[in-house]
Amino acid sequence: VTVIDTAVTTPIRWEAGGLRLAFEHDPDGPVRLVAIDGPEGDAASEPAGSARSAPRQPLVEVLSPAWGRVNNSYRYDGTALGAGLRLVDSTATSAGGVDRLEIVQRHEASGLVATTVLEAIAGVPAVRTTTTLRVEPGHAPLSVWAVTSLATGAVVSDAPNDVDLWWADSGWCSENRWTSRALRSPGLVAVDRTARGETSRNRLAISSLSTWSSGVANPAGAARDRRTGRTLAWQVEHNGAWAFELGEDPDWGHGGVPLEDRLFSETPFGPPRADRSRDGAYVAVLGPTDALHQWSVTLDGDTAFTTVPVSFTVAGSLDDALGRLAAQRRASRRPHAAGDALPVVFNDYMNTLEGDPTEGKLLPLIDAAARVGAEVFCIDAGWYDDTAGWWASVGDWQPSTARFPSGLPAVLDRIRAQGMVPGLWLEPEVVGLESRAARTLPDSAFLQRGGVRIVENARYLLDLRSPDARAHLDEAVDRLVDGLGVGFFKLDYNVTPGSGTDLDAPSVGAGLLEHNRALLTWLEAVLDRHPDLILENCGSGAMRSDAAMLRVLQMQSTSDQQDPLLYPMIAVGALGHILPEQAGNWAYPQPDMDDEMVVFTECTGLAGRLYQAGVLSGMDDHGLDLVADAVRVHKGTRYALAASTPRFPTGLPSWDDAWTTVAFDVADSPDTYVIAWRQAHAEAAVDLALPHLGGGDATVEQVYPAAGVGAGWTATRTAEGLRLDSGDGTGAPGARMYRVRVG
């Protein structure tokens, strides 16, 4: 237990962005975030008449080797410094459409000062929070191993027996696999832990590794009451290491005797307490930590540290909570006129040229892409390499002469002549061992350990803190944009450096965090110089799809998955943490596909930001017309999807689902767009839950493919939403897109 409530507490109340937050503090305890509610009457609000005790979890947890925890565990609650913080001041302000609450706390013995800043954008029911740590002058330096960006017992303490943790496991070509686990059994089992007067040592924990922020799991999660649906959701806004956990917080005020009251007592206390009805729970969300990521910093009079940002919200359902985080991401994005136009991009890589572009293969593909309506044509990996081994030669970014006898500029001119913006693939953060840059750049330009450059799969990794590294990249980008007229870059990131770099850093993980932040600063500077340049975020598929990168960049590749039958689960799952208008879902039709398979892969692209590929130059007129129709539909719906909240009528998808479905609830519109994919092993029909439609009448129109293409699907309005019937007794896969209009 971190804090035992005292009889007298003082509240701090803050309303912002449509949420109502309540904090408590007392003379003998730190500030605690005890309630997060929606507006009056909102389903996100705590049920009226709740008799639970206030959560005891401190607002800030700070783990230091000099102070440790008040109990023995490997959790990120119960830190001695967190328990010892006391309120100094709280200030609420508002400016530029952003409400701001600043809470300052101080730990007297160490001189630690923790300043927590919470911000909410007007009209967006979500809060972004960071905490800055410093040590007051005259106090000894303080080593820190971990500090929370968000820590609270609100929502999750309402009914710990009913709380499930939701998260999405991820991996190369298998991203966004959403799953849940109960906090108690099978999550944490009852172990009579109070027999020794100790809090639980266990927790449900999710974390990332290295610089692939979504390489192991997505940097977003939720805690949901499976009985009421009430959900607390969060996202880590960082392009590197992070962790979050959900754990128990026993209530010592009822039915139990703390360890300190047992010591030297003449009275036997017998077995552990049986009353756990007032136990609570907590959520802790962090950036990198010492135990997980080799991160630590030492605070002194000259050195402060600010945590990675975390945004959080609460809603009456998981869908609504994820939707409110989507609204937060949408409101926080860097404005970008060219990117916000949402042009249709054709990329020559996936199931097409596979990193082997040549003038002879590109020219007919360019013409075919223009015919179906593409607005950007991106030449992917290999354009700079004169051999077949493009992997280890990255880093110089000079056009190949062997691949383009007429010169790369002539190919880019052909793209422009067909009315499209030319684009190129770049992997800016790496330098291949066979490149000239590997020999000419100084060692200080690279991430390193013990004075040795880190090598991963025949590549070095640049350290974006280095002026030499940034100058190298600036020269390449400016040359390609100003000299060749490139208007789109696909930015890839296929290797990682492990825990980080110890060059000019207090710890390996701290060096990596500084590099991560320097990368974001460099990307901002690129767009400052080239405001019309569109940048796609691709990290070996979607291994770095986080809110920090997507605040700056315009588009995100959602996977490297090449099997069209496996992609829908990835595409729909991505919408749990990526905006539809940024979710670049690949569609890659092939000359040998039948109509249903062309429609299937194109529907995947339509479920977000259509990212077109495929050997279009080998398709007949009928096949090209099917693709062109999908592009036409996307152009007609892309701005609606960019104003929509994704909903999941058959639940967040699992890898082996027979049916995968998604609905786009368009703001300020009677329209909802529904896309459904049926696998070969599925039943012919499926029921979709669409409670946001209400019980009124609605018209349903199939928008893709056109009537008469493929099997005759039917869509019927039901009291719960919609019933789809594929009408196909053959068991073949299929997909359709519908518009449901209320009224």
What are these regions (language model features)?
Residues 2-269, 701-713:
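Polysaccharide-binding surfaces and accessory modules of carbohydrate-active proteins
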Residues 21, 36, 54, 519-715, ...:
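Active-site-proximal substrate-binding groove within the catalytic cores of carbohydrate-active enzymes
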Residues 131, 302, 346, 377, ...:
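Conserved, mostly hydrophobic/aromatic
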Residues 297-316, 731-740:
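Short Pro-Gly-centered flexible turn/kink motifs
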Residues 341-343, 354-357, 400-401, 428-479, ...:
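Active-site-adjacent "subsite" loops/lids of carbohydrate-active enzymes
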Residues 344-348, 379, 422-426, 489-491, ...:
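Hydrophobic faces of well-ordered beta-strands that scaffold small-molecule active sites
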Residues 385-435, 525-530:
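Acidic/aromatic-lined carbohydrate-recognition and catalytic surfaces
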